[in-house]
């Protein structure tokens, strides 16, 4: 929940640990930001729905349940036709156990793969509802069913920027007058064995003997990202709706932005998308460097991506303090953006900005003021959270204390 998450960030707690979700001994990198002791049965209803929920979907469902409780929203007291859900999701990988028998039946005597045998085996071996576990839109669908949210429902799958774009869409839905209240969320688990094998480990930190310090955004000695998992959900409402029900308002969204930096396939983004997104959201929010409290950075902990982001941040907001929560919990894909935005909401509400773990040696290629060692206080209670992807998309959300 929000309180545990917030105190863990303020205390600089480490969320990186050896992977024990499955047997990871065959992997080169065997650590990540795994959610410990997660029991979906505490949240998912009806229980039979678990059969058609991947771990990503379970996280999203649980986060929505916690968000509703935190916001004091009872779904039966909300107009269901003006209550919607928008979620940012990753591609959801299939479980190997589900496909093993089908795959073995598709192998011929000489060891080659037969698509004819595969198509025959799949009809006999796979459960009819198997696909529902792996459709990204099912997170928003399950949540809407459980919460009786019959209003606008959408899913955005655009890599690391997915969940901030979900916030942007949810805000737009309310501004267009289509809904009074929206659940905007993001979920992802990059610790799935199929995902780990498919993505490879070229961009990952190899600090297996010191995994607690592996994720070190913007630090000179960073050597790669750390995979993680998680989800977060914000309850977004029109002010009129929130005040009418006597809500505790944690913060207010000032503006959102989305930009894209076209690039050649062989090149990583140079940071122009981040720069454009920051300039756009600053202008729309009416903020400047004099009244901007902090930047919540994407902060992957990879060499070129961190440098590109840091230089873009410095070009737009100069020495505005920066925090990078992935240092605590790793990279949760589409879940990260909402987790980071939630951290900034709690920061502007409290007036305290959490530090970045493992930032020890400044990198000249990252000319930004990284908050580290201890939380920072006394800053304006405004913030911008920014995400960007290796394909060049960038998104940003500006918020303020109410």
Stretches found by the model and what they are:
Residues 21, 77-87, 154-158, 179-187, ...:
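Beta-strand segments within the central parallel beta-sheet cores of soluble alpha/beta enzyme folds
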